Amino acid sequence: MGASMEKQTVVTRFAPSPTGFLHIGGARTALFNWLFARHHGGKFLLRIEDTDRARSTQEAIDAILDGMRWLDLGWDGEVVYQFARAERHAEVARELLANGHAYRCYATPEELAELREQQRAAKQPLRYDGRWRDRDPSEAPAGAPFVIRLKAPRTGEVTIDDQVQGPVTVQNAELDDMILLRSDGTPTYMLAVVVDDHDMGVTHVIRGDDHLNNAFRQLALIRAMGWEEPVYAHIPLIHGADGAKLSKRHGALGVDAYRDELGLLSEAVNNYLLRLGWGHGDDEIISREQAVEWFDLAGVGRSPSRFDFKKLENLNGHYMREADDARLADLIAPGVAARAGREFDSADHDLLLRSIPFLKVRAKDINELAEGASFLFRTRPLDMDEKAASLLDDPGKALLAQAREALAATDDWSALALEAGVRSVAERGGIGLGKVAQPLRAALTGRTTSPGIFDVLALLGREESLGRLDDQLG
């Protein structure tokens, strides 16, 4: 049984716990929920499940919101904080108690520990045996602490027609009477989730398949309250390249690390996560507009997807080449300025912006782009890396001197005119253009890789270029 998309507005939610960063699996869950809601013209809600007060931190909440904004996964309405709704959760538990769908359980921790030991010894499943299910509360000692448990069905079965996993059936006898309110009056996670989803009008619960077992217990609670059941879609988890569940040993986990440490663009991460478990034919490069138009739950596979950093890196390279030059310049300016050890002025920004078209064609990420641009702002005389220094031996310097002479005689300081001057040196010596370009690149950048050497000359300008050559010629 599920909500009908035709009759009501689709409402999805992303409900992370703020006990750490927004991890990559959570980001994909958020993306799928966001796309499904947008595809159906519905609402996408954000709920912070901060009921674990010992582990929930404001820093983690900020990291989650920051990650969501970076991925451009805007939510509708205000953020819902679960802990603030504790009284509403308790109210529902009391309502269930009043209508006979819940009961007070006075079993002590010692009794429950003994029960578990007996079940272990008998090799039985560890579950509460319902000892207070039909007992009169007056049998308990006066003032004894109690929890409130759901009186779950004990016979029959429950089937979830999962939109990803297909129909999944569990015998009710396998489900125990879960705790709704603890002895201190605080609601459990299972109660809070169900109440919040109902009150927020959530029609589709799209989440990791590690929550599938929870769904059967949650459904028992929904039915006890007589509430409309959501449509469930439990998506497979993300695995590392070795097939094990994605963990720290596989590399970056937090969305912030993909941005700050790996230097990836948000659109590349979104595109990669979309294709990680969902497909649309052979399409690999999928725009945000196409994703909204095409996304459906039928395209989500049942098998775990393997995270491939190389594929993500290549995808990011594509988006780097497509990205707006001014945006890229703004993204790398702080890093390039830090490398240069100074504040950038408008002239520096202008030079950086002019360099982007030449640099972005070979950069796979923001870090590579920043490193590629740093030669423009290095202090003279340049530090040479080992390979560059080896190109400036005596034969290399002899070619450099000839190139310097040809460049100094060039009136039009444009890439085309500069190439003609350097090419004439190569032709006179009966050597390839690369033989002259190699020591020239080393002297101008201190490295052996850079944009095209004539683009480098044009970007640096006459005075800076000739000055750098003179530094190496002594």
Swiss-Prot record:
Intervals of motif 'HIGH' region: 16-26
Family that this chain belongs to: Belongs to the class-I aminoacyl-tRNA synthetase family. Glutamate--tRNA ligase type 1 subfamily.
GO BP annotation list: glutamyl-tRNA aminoacylation
Binding-site positions, ATP: 248
EC number(s) per entry: 6.1.1.17
Quaternary state and interactors: Monomer.
Gene Ontology terms, MF aspect: ATP binding; glutamate-tRNA ligase activity; tRNA binding; zinc ion binding
Pfam families xrefs: Anticodon_2, tRNA-synt_1c
InterPro entries, A to Z: aa-tRNA-synth_I_cd-bd, aa-tRNA-synth_I_codon-bd_sub2, aa-tRNA-synth_I_CS, aa_tRNA-synth_I_cd-bd_sf, Glu-tRNA-ligase_bac/mito, Glu/Gln-tRNA-synth, Glu/Gln-tRNA-synth_Ib_cat-dom, GluQ/Sye
GO CC annotation, single: cytosol
Keyword set, alphabetical order: Aminoacyl-tRNA synthetase, ATP-binding, Cytoplasm, Ligase, Nucleotide-binding, Protein biosynthesis
Motif ('KMSKS' region): 245-249
Keyword field contains Nucleotidyltransferase: no
Family matches, as PANTHER family: GLUTAMATE--TRNA LIGASE, GLUTAMATE--TRNA LIGASE, MITOCHONDRIAL-RELATED
Database matches in PROSITE patterns: AA_TRNA_LIGASE_I
Domain of life: Bacteria
Name of this chain's protein: Glutamate--tRNA ligase 2
Catalytic activity: tRNA(Glu) + L-glutamate + ATP = L-glutamyl-tRNA(Glu) + AMP + diphosphate
Subcellular location: Cytoplasm
Job of this protein: Catalyzes the attachment of glutamate to tRNA(Glu) in a two-step reaction: glutamate is first activated by ATP to form Glu-AMP and then transferred to the acceptor end of tRNA(Glu).
